[in-house]
Every structure is written in C-alpha cells, then in structure tokens.
Amino acid sequence: MRIFIALFPILLLCSGMTSDTFREKQLNYTRVREAYASKEKIVEKTLTGHSVSRDNLRIYLRVFKTEKIMEMWAKNCSDSVFSLVKEFPICDLSGDVGAKRRSRDLQVPEGFYHISGLNPYSKYYLSIKVNYPNASDSIRGVRKHLGNNIFIHGSCISSGCLAMTDDRIRELYVYCVEAYNAGQEEIGLTIFPARLSDATYSNLLSWYGRYKDDVKLWGDLKKSYDLFEKTKIPPAVKFLPDGTHDVK
C-alpha cells in the first residue's frame, strides 16, 4: 500500500518569489489591506525582536486544545531551529479532546496538518484553511462522511473550527501572507489535545484510555511534542497505511 509522506523540514527550504508577489495579490482585497494597516508594524516589530527577517520568514504553528492556545514559531529560512515568537489565545473551539472522525461531530481535528489556503472573503472576516481530512483522517475516519472546511478564522463562534477573534486573525493572517511571500511552500500545523508533558499525557491515557483510536494518535503526537521540545525542529512525519504515523 502507498505510504503518504509529509516532511515538514524539507518544505521549509529557502526559495524565491516572482516579482508579482503573493503579498501584492493579497493586498487587492479590502480585509487584507485592513489587516496590514492595523498589524503590519506589530508583525515587523515582533519578528525583528526575534532576529527574524520578513523577507526570509518561515513559520510553524502548534495548537493546544485544552489550553486554547496557538503557538507561532518562526525562523529565517537559512536557520536550523525555530523560536517561539507569539502565543495567540483561541477564543472558541468546539468539541472535546480527541480526533475528528466524521462530519458534524463538531470536533476540532487533532494531528499533523498544514495550511492549504487563505480566504480574504470569509464569513468570519478572514480565514485560514486547514488541510483536513489528512491522509490519516481519510483512513481512520468514517468513509464518505469525513467532513471538511476546517478553518482558523475570525469571530468567536466555533463549529469544529478555531475561532480567534477578528483582531487576532488579522495578525495571524499577515504572518501567513508574509511567510508565503518569502517563499515558504507549506506552513505546518500540529494540533494537540493539550500540552503533552509526561504528566498530562499520563492523565489523558488514564481518563480516555478506552478510546483506542485517540490513544494511538496521542502516542504519535506525544513523540512529535517531545522531539520538537528538544530540538525546536518540526519532526518528519510519515502517514502509514493503517492511519498511524512514523515520527522522526
């Protein structure tokens, strides 16, 4: 069977953009111009404070559902490791810990994802699309009823999405535009049930151990969490034929 591969470090290599830049195209939209008017200076100051150039920007996102926090890590494309540059509180997310396995279950997904698009016309001001379902979801979820359209967006209402507020989505959207404009091909996003310290992971297994599907996923996420905490480099992740992952 085919093994699906997502190699986040490889996709973070430096590359150039054409003169018709991604930023210029995005600035054709009113809400993106509003986001830049209110957040560009903040973004520039934050990156400069961490010695990261917007012209060489690479970002990586981690979400912790229980804590309702999104971390944004950044580096220059020539750097080897990421630095934590911003924590965004999540205003609302529906569901409980555990993976999303079918449509209309109101669950926020968990696992290894990437950003698959930016929407400047969102019903929720601005939105950032998550590539749910990923290869694992397609194998382990309810076939033909997986659901889709999972976004990080404005407002403070969630039906399986990550609602950030309009103010926070403006800033996050600008970071994403800048990363794409600097040549990043894929922005990695890992969604955890919680910050997976040894104690928290043990508690999850104790409280939810009967949910074998979630336990398998959490084991893979725990390995990813520990590796990143140690190296500050997103691990390489292979999606295996049974829907589990090889994390290195």
Regions inferred by a protein language model and the residue ranges of each:
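Generic structural signal for short, solvent-exposed loop/turn connectors between secondary structure elements
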Residues: 1-3, 156
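Sec-dependent N-terminal signal peptides
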Residues: 3-13
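Cell wall/extracellular polymer interaction/catalysis modules
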Residues: 17-159, 167-187, 196-248
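A conserved hydrophobic position in a structured secondary element of the catalytic/binding core
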Residues: 164
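Hydrophobic transmembrane alpha-helices
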Residues: 191-193
